[in-house]
Amino acid sequence: VFSLVLPVLFLLMGGIGLPGGAVYIERDRIRSRFMQSAMSLAGPLSNLLFAIVLGLVLRFWPSIDQRFLPGLSFLLVLQISAVLFNLIPLPPFDGYSILEPFLHPVVREQFDRFRGVTIWIVLLAFWYVPFISDMFWEGVYNFSTILGVNWTLVIAGLERFRFWEL
């Protein structure tokens, strides 16, 4: 359910670059705390690497068909938004799962009490607390700009992505 419902919800909220529901990991089978953290880092790291590859393509592939530039630029921004969103250090996000193996059991128990509602609190905060969404999108803007994004192309890509508003 979450693999389909969450992506549609995120698209309706304006295209935040998130995949579906989380993948279950049997953490008790992984002996090293560092490996547990590394597994949780794999998702955001893959989004970051993909964003870097897109940035390199946009910057150093001069013969690319110009019609692809808006879509690739927008996709890069979606990847950066996925990195930053998933690194939020609250459960059930990857940012928390990276830290979780190193937390004291009492602290983990306190966080686990709210695991089921935290995502909704974060989404509501993004929706209703301008400071939080502004801070997030400023981070997305800054990291994307470091990768050389042309924001005129990003806006054009967003407009094409939201085809239902045309």
Residue ranges of predicted features:
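Hydrophobic transmembrane alpha-helices and their immediate loop junctions
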Residues: 1-166
